[in-house]
Amino acid sequence: MAIAYNLGKGEYKNWIISETEFNENNLPKFETIFSLGNGYMGLRAATEEHYFNETRGCYVAGMFDRFKGEVAELPNIPDYVGMEIKLDGERFNLNQGKIISYHRYLNVKDGELVREVEWQSPAGNITKLVFKRFVSLANLHLAGFKIKIIPVNYSGKVAIKTGYNGQVTNSGVQHFVEGDKRVLPDGKSYLTVRTQESGIFTIVAGKFRFLINASEINPQQQIVTGRRQLFLRSEYELKENECLEMEKCVIVYTGRDLEFKDKDIDSGDIVETALTTLDKAGTKRYEELFSEHRQKWHKLWHEIDIEIGGPDFDQLAVRFAQYHLVQMTPSHDSRISVAAKGLSGEGYKGHVFWDTEIFILPFFIYTFPQIARKLLEYRYHTLDGARKKARENGYKGAMYPWESADTGEETTPEFGEVDIKTGKPIRIWCGEIEQHITADVAYAIWHYYQVTGDKEFMYNYGTEIFMETARFWASRLEYNQGLDRYEIKDVIGPDEYSEHVNNNAYTNYMVKWHLEKAIDIYNWLSDDSRDILEKIINKIALKEDELNEWKKKKDKIYLPFQEDSKVIPQFDGFMDQDVIDISSYRGDVGAIMKAYSWDEITSSQVIKQADVVMLLYLLGEDFSHEVKEKNYHYYEPKTLHDSSLSPSIHAIMGKEIGDLDEAYRYFNKSTTIDLGRNMRSCDAGLHSASLGGIWQAVVLGFGGVKVKDNVLNIDPMLPEKWDYLNFKLKWQGMPIRVEIRNDRVSVSFLNDDKAMLKDVSVMVKGRNLQLNNNKAVVNL
């Protein structure tokens, strides 16, 4: 097979994902899973040489542009990776000649992508080539590249053409207009462009270094230009077994970067900043720049690495998930958040969904709470967009968009795929009626506060969001006079195969929770810091009558539940719909649409992803074990898992009901969504939520971590194939290590500074322990 998981050796065992053979058809898969990033920019792993099936991509977080008649998307900035290599007159292309050996691998411990090739050209010339690259954690604006070329059985001329290509597009859409091109006397060069609609200035600058047999040379370079293109071409005479090295240091800046926020700058200032940064970095060799980057990664891994005593693939898969969660997240800037595909591809146009708050955020809450806070601050910075959406739809308060970009306004496209039977494009209703995201944001805020105790966040951001979103729900509820209850009609729940439904259980239960928690927060703040509360009340003009309205309405919200069967109907009428045998459609996303029309699917008990099961996970303390078990077994056979968000939730709930085989089966399913052997699984980018779900399945699922009555609970159950599970987390700001064995659980502080520690109450397997400078051990 083209992918291997076991080629990491020694200290790199279970840290390496390998591509072991070249196949142009597989390029999109590896471009995605081998993508590099640092939260500021993400780089798809397109090869240096060009192929027909490639999708080259470099994306800067928070940078959006809108083409006429379309929604805003993350534009593909000028490509700085591509190059043309000619070896004794023959173009280096792996579709020609013969591949003697090939190995490309991503090292997630170091954050480096390496490709080693031995290639025989059609003329019989054999060349060894090594390509290395990284996107720096030490300098968010920097990417580094190194290439080695060794002619094995010939002497001849080697030519390299590389530079910057601004003709790249987003699936054909060109977002940039021409700027400047410069080649400077000191070896620096750059290309500038500007987005067409949003007007964001962008510079890609670089400096190249060439060596033959480790001695630096200054080759004559030919300048090649085109529209939005600047390349430098150079030639070298190499003897047999001589080694040519090229190092490239690239710097990227844009006009929306945090460094320039609220500053009176022009494009010249941005160019100067980029060139100054390049001057400092350009004096360093690849190894030095990479070493600085690698040290940052190793420091991160010291804080977050999870150790699994089980199958090697499980260990690798969790590290793969954590690596990508870190590299795709804009931890430097609270004005932006994590896109559904991270920074690894054009899928979903770089938009932010509920994926961030419900699936990705928990990883950061428990490992890097300062980053989690910034992701939540994004929702505060875009609160005006949510207020605007509420007004435009006739509601009060703040109604978060289903898909969000930089402003917080709704960016969901109106139409999607074509219906196989009608031939008409399917209307996408999510932007109008998939409204549970507003409760999801509130849930994430409360989850963050429970784990961190960050009052300052609640004072300045969280409470205002909670009150404004509670306002929305109070205005959204519809009173059913005949049944004396409040309902929520015409919505989409998490299951997007059921549209225009009434009283989606997930939505209704979450709204009741939302209103209750808003009242609790109001009362808490009234006691804790009345002056802060008064400031918020005055800012948003919150009246006491509104609070009384919330209290009245929350107690009358209809919560679907069948007392006899203990099943929660997913929505009104769901239990009366036809049941389709979906077994033959599982495992092939969208396959059911080739056999049934959209209307047939939406009117049957066919579920795209966890819906009621999702509810049981998030509000688990509100439901008995019996209710969880009966609903899991009712809904699981009806769920296609056509969304990558679904398997990890079923893994967690499988463990919750005590079915470890089921839990482990779904954990395996979640780990193979991106990393598995399906070569078509992630062409458009990574499944960010799924990666967050993998971490949750391990730590919050098998590790049993949850917050109950404001106390950290640890109630683990390990899969049969695991002997141990070790992980670290932060609770109320204190680093804690958890070690789980089949016969015991130990919990200890990681900080040796006793002055920084405080007594912590931890519930382990139902036993209340005091953690105060000592390791607490519970025998099972």
From Swiss-Prot:
GO molecular function, one term: kojibiose phosphorylase activity
Keywords, comma-separated and alphabetical: Carbohydrate metabolism, Glycosyltransferase, Transferase
UniProt EC number: 2.4.1.230
Pfam families: Glyco_hydro_65C, Glyco_hydro_65m, Glyco_hydro_65N
Keyword Transferase: yes
Ligand binding (substrate): W354, D355, K608, Q609
Catalytic class of the enzyme: transferase
Active site: E496
Catalytic activity field: kojibiose + phosphate = beta-D-glucose 1-phosphate + D-glucose
GO biological process, one term: carbohydrate metabolic process
Keyword Magnesium attributed: no
Similarity section: Belongs to the glycosyl hydrolase 65 family.
Protein name: Kojibiose phosphorylase
